[in-house]
Design a protein with these regions (language model features):
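Hydrophobic small-molecule pocket/channel-lining residues, especially in calycin-type beta-barrels
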Residues: 19-174
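Sec-dependent N-terminal signal peptides
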Residues: 4-13
Length: 174
C-alpha cells in the first residue's frame, strides 16, 4: 500500500510540475517581447513551404494577434498571445477547427526562448484528437525569430516543424 501511495504522489508531482506557469516577472517581460513583433513577417518552414504572418497589438495593448496567411492552403490561422493575470498564454485558432490554449511553462532567463504547453482547448472532445500541443518561440534579434510547433494525436506527438521568420521591410507610403 505504501508503494502505491508513493507512486501516486510521485505521479502527481510530475504532472503538476509540467503544468506550472513560467514566473510572473518573465511572463510580463515576455509579453513585451511579443508586442515588439508588430508588423509583417515572412517565414520558411523546415518542410519547405513559405508563409506570410502579420502581428498586430490589439485590444488596447492587451493582446497580440498573429495572423498566418499561408501555413495551411486556402486558410488563415490565428494565434492570440496575452497575459492571464501573471501567466503568459496563447490560443491557436487552427484549421483543424479546434482552439488549443497553451501556457508559457518555460521562459529562458535571457527572455529569448518561450515554451508553451497544452493547457486545454475548445472544440476538442478528447486530447487524443489532433491539435497543436506545444509551441516554442526563439527570438534571435529584432528582425528574426523561429517557431516550432508540435502536433499531438492519439497519445503521440505526430510531427514537429520549425519556421524561420524574418521581418519584412516596411513599405514606403505613396
Amino acid at each position: 500500500m505504501r508503494k502505491l501511495s508513493l507512486l501516486v504522489l510521485l505521479f502527481a508531482c510530475f504532472t503538476f510540475a509540467a503544468d506550472k506557469p513560467a514566473s510572473p516577472e518573465l511572463s510580463k517581460q515576455g509579453y513585451e517581447q511579443f508586442k515588439s513583433l508588430q508588423g509583417d513577417w515572412i517565414g520558411t518552414s523546415t518542410k519547405g513551404w513559405k508563409e506570410e504572418i502579420r502581428f498586430n497589438v490589439i485590444a488596447a495593448g492587451s493582446a497580440v494577434e498573429e495572423r498566418s496567411f499561408d501555413a495551411h492552403p486556402g486558410e488563415t490561422m490565428l494565434t492570440i498571445v496575452h497575459l492571464d493575470g501573471e501567466r503568459l498564454m496563447l490560443t491557436h485558432y487552427c484549421a483543424a477547427k479546434n482552439q488549443p490554449r497553451l501556457l508559457a511553462t518555460t521562459i529562458s532567463p535571457d527572455g529569448k526562448t518561450f515554451e508553451f504547453t497544452f493547457l486545454d482547448a475548445t472544440n476538442l472532445p478528447s486530447r487524443d484528437k489532433g491539435h497543436m500541443d506545444k509551441a516554442v518561440y526563439r527570438f534571435i534579434d529584432e528582425n528574426h525569430f523561429t517557431t516550432k510547433w508540435t502536433w499531438y494525436e492519439n497519445g503521440q506527438e505526430k510531427w514537429l516543424e520549425e519556421i524561420q521568420m524574418e521581418r519584412m521591410p516596411v513599405k514606403a507610403a505613396k
